[in-house]
């Protein structure tokens, strides 16, 4: 029985803040109706961890139905409310994942907080529903922002174009291989989902860090050469092609046409 209670926690540990793993969500949804209350509790909170900070609509709908299903069981209803809080944490701007967005480096403090929470959930009724509910504050060390914000050297917001796509493993590859695939171009600030990586779409600025996540400082690139499009925008004179036609110009154009 004890081994069965750890299965949902192990599944959640594999996909923290990664609701794109549909198989894990399906398995946890089935186990959330288990006759064993401990298994159901662990499955419900695991659903919240898998969708933590993502506002995932599928998990949110499942948790709302579970709140109705367990409306007369206070312990399980508390677990559902906790899972809902994890799902909508930070209004979708934070993550609980121990990995950085491109899943290349693990954050040890976040991993320690997640593992500590797993140990607490092994005895949820005695600890959290007893006198030690404050143990849930270990979640505080697991919360990290998942947005990318760019600032200039004066710490003022600096919107720039970035390409966001699925991270590609480039370890051991020669030359300068592509680091992302299937990218889309956005203007900062942007949100990075699990497994995504961002890179600057312009060489006008240089990042002061090699990993684009969280708050990134940018500085002007001294070797940047403005493109012809940028020069055209700066040197455009009044009366150009896009200027509106004045009434006097309309009269001069229409006067010769009146002879026809």
Model-based region annotation:
Residues 1-260:
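Long internal repeat-built scaffold domains in very large eukaryotic proteins
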């Amino acid at each position: 029985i004890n081994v069965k209670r750890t299965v949902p926690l192990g599944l959640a540990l594999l996909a923290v803040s990664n609701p794109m793993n549909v198989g894990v969500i399906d398995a946890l949804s089935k186990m959330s109706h288990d006759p064993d209350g401990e298994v159901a509790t662990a499955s419900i909170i695991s659903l919240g961890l898998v969708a933590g900070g993502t506002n995932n609509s599928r998990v949110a709908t499942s948790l709302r139905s579970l709140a109705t299903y367990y409306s007369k069981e206070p312990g399980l209803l508390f677990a559902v409310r906790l899972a809902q809080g994890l799902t909508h944490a930070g209004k979708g701007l934070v993550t609980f994942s121990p990995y950085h967005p491109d899943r290349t480096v693990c954050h040890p403090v976040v991993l320690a907080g997640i593992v500590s929470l797993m140990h607490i959930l092994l005895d949820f009724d005695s600890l959290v529903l007893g006198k030690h509910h404050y143990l849930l504050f270990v979640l505080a060390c697991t919360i990290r922002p998942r947005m990318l914000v760019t600032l200039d050297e004066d710490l003022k917001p600096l919107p720039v174009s970035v390409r966001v796509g699925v991270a590609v493993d480039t370890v051991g590859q020669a030359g300068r291989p592509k680091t992302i695939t299937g990218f889309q171009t956005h203007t900062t600030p942007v949100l990075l989902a699990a497994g995504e990586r961002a890179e600057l779409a312009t060489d006008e600025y240089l990042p002061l860090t090699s990993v684009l996540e969280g708050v990134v400082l940018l500085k002007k690139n001294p070797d940047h050469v403005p493109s012809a499009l940028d020069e055209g925008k700066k040197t455009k004179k009044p009366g150009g092609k896009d200027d509106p036609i004045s009434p006097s110009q309309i009269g001069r154009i229409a006067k010769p046409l009146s002879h026809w």
